[in-house]
Amino acid sequence: MHLNKIRGKNMKKSHILGIIICIILIVGFFISFDSTFLDNPKMMSKSKNNIRNAENLTNISKNSNNLKFLWAYQLQNADIDEIANSNFTLIVIDYSKDGTENGKYSEEEIEKLKKAGKIPIAYISIGEAEDYRFYWDNEWLKNPPKWLGDENPEWEGCYAVKYWHPEWKKIIFSYLDKIIQQGFCGVYLDKVDEFEYWAENGYDEDFTAKEMIKFIVEISNYCRNKTNNSFIIIPQNGERLLEYDKHGKLLNTVSGWAVEDLFYDGVEQKTEEEINERIKLLDKVKDSGKFVLVVDYVDDGTKTNENLKRVEDFINKSLDKGYVPYVAKSDRELDELNTWWLKLIN
């Protein structure tokens, strides 16, 4: 691993230092990924002091050796101090507290996370345009660019994009410039599964899948050329892309993979058929020596035994597969750092 393109005279020393810190954190992260993270009793005793009390907890230690690190996923109102003092190692947050340019985190705030030993990863949607982002032009509602598609009926203000168009790629690269400048150590790529949407709306899936693979590789090259070769790339969902990755270029490019709703759809269990169809692809990632992150929205926020058992079941199933779980609230808002469930892992 080495620094690339940091020779520019105008690059601030603090930015160069931030890149170096990212490299150190990421190298340490992958070293710990090859060890048993939860074997450290001090870490676990610390976590128990930071989470709420719960009664009748079932010990999940039979699978805890499969857990190499902890990760968290919060896209709204993230508190930098709270995250810095948490036991999560890999942190996925938005580049902005509220999604807008005015709310973006400062370089100093991201630096604070890194100094606390956290690896900050920036969320970015590459398959949809969001009307609250810095790049949005309200004129598009009257005169949409040729790459802008329909609004997502489940997420107001989010619009499908033909991500293979140069105009959209230019927007994403400018977005990545902001993320890199802030000092993030990687990106979390959402809506990579948009290739399936366009395959259902007039395009051949072989084309849409290969164009998404190409885009992810381009994003990786862009970020790593501007920072370092260890810059983390994590796609979310869309693991069927691996079926089109005939020469392994995508798998060689990504640092790991993340999925939502693997074992549960909200608080409802998925069928074995649904689960196994995804696991056979996710295991390709795991078997290549890379991590698999899983976030299921299983926590309904109550202290009932039903909720507890569901959360335990999700954790156990994830650990049994060698995946890294994060228990999220069932409202899917991702507006808080959910920590109480960590007490189940001891």
Curated annotation (Swiss-Prot):
The chain crosses the membrane at residues 16-36. It holds the Pfam family Glyco_hydro_114. The keyword Nucleotide-binding does not apply. Keywords: Membrane, Transmembrane, Transmembrane helix. GO terms for cellular component: membrane. The keyword Transmembrane applies. NCBIfam families: MJ1477/TM1410 family putative glycoside hydrolase (TIGR01370). PANTHER family: PELA, PTHR35882:SF1. This is Uncharacterized protein MJ1477. It comes from Methanocaldococcus jannaschii (strain ATCC 43067 / DSM 2661 / JAL-1 / JCM 10045 / NBRC 100440).
